Amino acid sequence: MAPLGALLAAAALAAAGCGGSGDEATTVVRTVTETVPATTTPAGAAATGTTETTAPDRRAARATAEAALLRLEDLPSGWVAQDETEEPEPAGAACWRAAGVTATVADAVAPSFTGPSMSAVTNAVALFPDADAASAGVKAVGDAKLRACLARELTAFLRGSIDRDRYEEAQVFDAETAALSVAPYGAESAGFRITVPLDDGTTRAELYGDWIAIRDGAAVTQLSFISAIRPPEEAFRDDLSRTAATRLRAATGG
């Protein structure tokens, strides 16, 4: 593989992994906290009244989140599920905290999926205390200040991920971000795109990341589509987003 191709492939995998995974990790639609909310509204229920959260409730919520995740069989032939690695706090977590996104009751993260042409997909599902909190998490995607913060964090993350022994002259330029027009998946959906220019010392190309959040009741499924050189294919992104929305509704009983 040419130096630029290898650099883009490494950056795509790093960008896909920046959402974190593992029990204590966070997703792009949640805030890191040390405690679980004392009261919750069951996923999919109206945001009225509260019920006491018990350990079995949290286990059930986690099982619901896991059931809503994308699976390898949802992707075209040739895609591969990567081994999970734990990331205590992913790039961008501080941005969501600053935006005031509420802590989740439970969440689950699928392994990163990698495909042809230096592409990757990630998926995470979060259950919020109620539908209003989940809606706030989706609406935050439309905040230009939040997107700018995430772009800065992703740029810094990728710069720190470059193997300088292999790519001594490589550069990661400042990322740009814009709102992304997405179909009306689920009860509510929103998206944005981050574009990161890279240079291996002789050639310049772009790394694209499309992030989509879809809500159903008190649950949100978040997808990221990473692609090198050209933006993610819209038809592929749409098909997988619809699959994720359908699975979220089935898992939550919406």
Q: Where are the regions that the model predicts?
A:
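A small/polar (G/S/T-enriched), proline-flanked helix-loop surface module common
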Residues: 81-205
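C-terminal motif of bacterial Sec signal peptides marking the signal peptidase cleavage site
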Residues: 14-17
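Extracellular mucin-like PTS domains
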Residues: 26-54
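A short, solvent-exposed beta-edge/loop patch
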Residues: 49-52, 63, 168-247, 252
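Second-shell loop/turn segments in exported
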Residues: 59-61, 121-129, 227-234
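Bacterial signal peptide processing site
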Residues: 19-22
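Bacterial N-terminal signal peptides that target proteins for export
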Residues: 1-8
